[in-house]
């Protein structure tokens, strides 16, 4: 995924910023507490496809 997209993409639920996960397989929304998958370089920004962040992930800076 092109990291330049992070400057223009926002969480569709809370409209907050997104952060690329360390392994570059998900976009993380701390505001919504969700992780959106990246498949074949394309972020899947659907709430139904996102996973809920764990408590540790929510607290991790």
Curated annotation (Swiss-Prot):
Top-level lineage group: Bacteria
InterPro entries (alphabetical): Trm112-like
Cellular compartments per GO CC: cytosol
Coiled coil stretches, renumbered: none
Pfam families, per the entry: Trm112p
HAMAP family for this protein: UPF0434
Family: Belongs to the UPF0434 family.
PANTHER family: PROTEIN PREY, MITOCHONDRIAL (PTHR33505:SF4), ZGC:162634 (PTHR33505)
Name under which the protein is recorded: UPF0434 protein PFLU_3771
């Amino acid at each position: 995924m092109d990291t330049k997209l992070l400057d223009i993409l926002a969480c569709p639920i809370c409209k907050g910023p997104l952060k690329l996960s360390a392994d570059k397989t998900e976009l993380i929304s701390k505001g919504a507490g969700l992780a959106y998958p990246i498949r074949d370089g394309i972020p899947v920004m659907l709430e139904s496809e996102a996973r809920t962040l764990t408590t540790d992930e929510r607290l991790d800076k």
